[in-house]
């Protein structure tokens, strides 16, 4: 170091000045090295720049209790929960990303190696697993839509009881279809047609609680079949349904059994006829009918089905409980299996928006797969979402449960949202509300992606379909959610009914897989080839 001094200056002063200057330089170097050292030693939230004890406490209370959680947050989120400026929030996030090694570039071969650690949950069907690249992926959102018109239908003369604004109607399901088709029009769907319903309510039995209540019917569906199963009861009633249609029996408790498997001597469960006719609906008013005969009959005509989103059944005027469509419990059982059997040794979180979760179905699948039904049920955590805000809140609360089970022998490995869009669709009606709905849905999907990536879990969502009025060719339906959901879901699978009671899954979008189809069946074991 060189210091310029005046002539005649004391050399000792120069020396001292040089030493002081040198000390200043050493101090600067020491400060720089300390800064670097400090940056390298970020191991907790308090180590982040600008985060003191008070801010750290606010972040933890809001669920941002790890560097990874902060790294994937948005500046606006941190600004709101911590009461800091957006600029300060951005600096905190950037430091967290650097400390957690997120947001940096990685060579493709290294990324490929990282993807080898991704877990997959078997669906129970080898053909469907192959279509999905090995099963339902962790760190991804898999969307399934189009499960509608499942082939579980009734003969055209089946009587139905329904209400419009408390005005009762009792007529055949064929007459009901014709009436609403003339008002609302019918849409081609799968092997038949569907008519949207508005302000139509039926009485339904909640199997889980045993309660009878009034609920909304969303669609009425029809298709043609050649043969039906006729089930005659000792009370004089009879059912004419397709072979795969579930019938509510009393076999070691209440359970749904496909019509083709019903035998003489079985007991069909219904609701007391006089209770329904007086419209005095109360809990526990059940009656039982013994099956006297079961036979296959030639039919070659239209069969019909009502779509009941909430409980998937409705009560006919004769008191019999009639089932409609229901699926998606298999994964909740399969994920609990060890990896060598297609699972991930994991627990399940199920966010239920339409009251579609059925523990009875879980028990049936688990029992037929040789598992302890009670143990399987213990590792499924269910919450009912009553509106879109509640649904989004439950995703945030799900993170608490994920953290709670993180270091146990059954960490959460599957998050199910059934259905993803039903509340958004019913609450935000019309073009004027579309922008707000899509923004809210985008935030919801971002939260799901964050959980999937941060905790290495699989997110499985079901979706509804709607008609495309401008579609003159091809499939006239499309999934709800628009471009927001189309671009956010990692894999999109379209389900439709095939011939002979089989189902067809079509992979329509995936970043690493070709489009294709797989055929599978729904049995007492869930999904099978």
UniProtKB/Swiss-Prot annotation:
Question: Which is a GO BP term held by this UniProt record?
Answer: intein-mediated protein splicing
Listed PROSITE patterns? INTEIN_C_TER, INTEIN_N_TER, RECA_2, RECA_3
Q: Which GO terms describe its molecular function?
A: ATP binding; ATP-dependent DNA damage sensor activity; damaged DNA binding
Q: Read off the InterPro entries from this record.
A: DNA_recomb/repair_Rad51_C (IPR013632), DNA_recomb/repair_RadA (IPR011938), DNA_repair_Rad51/TF_NusA_a-hlx (IPR010995), Hint_dom_C (IPR003586), Hint_dom_N (IPR003587), Hint_dom_sf (IPR036844), Hlx-hairpin-Hlx_DNA-bd_motif (IPR003583), Intein_C (IPR030934)
Q: Does the keyword DNA-binding apply?
A: yes
Return the Pfam families for the record. HHH_5, Intein_splicing, Rad51
Q: Which domain of life is it from?
A: Archaea
Q: How is it modified after translation?
A: This protein undergoes a protein self splicing that involves a post-translational excision of the intervening region (intein) followed by peptide ligation.
Q: Which UniProt keywords apply?
A: ATP-binding, Autocatalytic cleavage, DNA damage, DNA recombination, DNA-binding, Nucleotide-binding, Protein splicing
Q: What else is known?
A: The intein interrupts the ATP-binding site.
Summarizing the function annotation, the protein's role is: Involved in DNA repair and in homologous recombination. Binds and assemble on single-stranded DNA to form a nucleoprotein filament. Hydrolyzes ATP in a ssDNA-dependent manner and promotes DNA strand exchange between homologous DNA molecules.
UniProt-listed HAMAP family: RadA_arch
Which family does the entry's similarity section mention?
Belongs to the eukaryotic RecA-like protein family.
Q: What is this protein called?
A: DNA repair and recombination protein RadA
Organism of origin: Pyrococcus horikoshii (strain ATCC 700860 / DSM 12428 / JCM 9974 / NBRC 100139 / OT-3)
Which gene is transcribed and translated to give this protein? radA
């Amino acid at each position: 170091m060189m210091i310029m001094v005046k002539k005649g200056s004391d050399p000792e002063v120069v020396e001292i000045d040089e030493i002081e200057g040198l000390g200043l330089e050493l101090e600067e170097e020491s400060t720089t090295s300390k800064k670097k050292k400090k940056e390298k030693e970020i191991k907790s939230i308090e180590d982040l720049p600008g985060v003191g004890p008070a801010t750290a406490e606010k972040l933890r209370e809001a669920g941002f209790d790890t560097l990874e959680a902060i790294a994937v947050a948005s500046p606006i989120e941190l600004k709101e929960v911590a009461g800091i400026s957006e600029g300060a929030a951005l600096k905190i996030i950037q430091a967290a990303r650097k400390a957690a090694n997120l947001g940096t570039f990685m060579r493709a071969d290294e990324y490929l190696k990282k993807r080898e650690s991704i877990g997959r949950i078997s669906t129970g069907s080898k053909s469907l697993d192959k279509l999905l690249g090995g099963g339902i992926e962790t760190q991804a959102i898999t969307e399934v839509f189009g499960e509608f018109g499942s082939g579980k239908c009734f003969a055209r003369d089946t009587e139905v009881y329904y209400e419009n604004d408390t005005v009762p109607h009792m007529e055949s399901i064929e007459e009901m279809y014709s009436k609403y088709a003339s008002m609302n029009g019918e849409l081609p769907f799968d092997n038949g047609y569907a008519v949207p319903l508005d302000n139509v309510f039926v009485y339904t039995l909640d199997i889980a609680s045993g309660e009878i209540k009034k609920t909304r019917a969303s669609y009425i569906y029809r298709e043609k079949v050649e043969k039906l199963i006729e089930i005659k009861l000792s009370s004089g009633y009879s059912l004419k349904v397709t072979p795969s249609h579930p019938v509510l029996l009393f076999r070691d408790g209440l359970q749904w059994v496909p019509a083709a498997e019903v035998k003489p001597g079985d007991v069909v469960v219904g609701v007391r006829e006089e209770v329904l006719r007086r419209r005095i609906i109360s809990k526990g008013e059940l009656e039982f009918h013994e099956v006297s005969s079961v036979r296959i009959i030639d039919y070659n005509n239209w069969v019909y089905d009502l779509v009941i989103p909430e409980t998937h059944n409705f009560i006919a005027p004769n008191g019999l409980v009639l089932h409609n469509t229901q699926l998606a419990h298999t994964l909740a059982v399969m994920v609990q299996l060890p990896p060598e059997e297609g699972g991930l040794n994991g627990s399940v979180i199920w966010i239920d928006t339409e009251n579609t979760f059925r523990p009875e179905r879980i028990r049936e699948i688990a029992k037929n797969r040789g598992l302890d039904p009670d143990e399987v049920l213990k590792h499924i955590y269910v919450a009912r979402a009553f509106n879109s805000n509640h649904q989004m809140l439950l995703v945030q609360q799900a993170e608490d449960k994920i953290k709670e089970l993180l270091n146990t022998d059954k960490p959460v490995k599957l998050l199910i949202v059934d259905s993803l869009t039903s509340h958004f669709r019913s609450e935000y009606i019309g073009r004027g509300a579309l922008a707000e709905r899509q923004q809210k849905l985008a935030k919801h999907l971002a939260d799901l992606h964050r959980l999937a990536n941060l905790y290495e879990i699989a997110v499985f969502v079901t979706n509804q379909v709607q008609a495309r009025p401008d579609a003159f060719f091809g499939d006239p339906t499309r999934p709800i959610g628009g471009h927001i959901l189309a671009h956010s879901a990692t894999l999109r699978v379209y389900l439709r009914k095939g011939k002979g009671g089989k189902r067809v899954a079509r992979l329509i979008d995936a970043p690493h897989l070709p489009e294709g189809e797989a055929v599978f069946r729904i049995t007492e074991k869930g999904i099978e080839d």
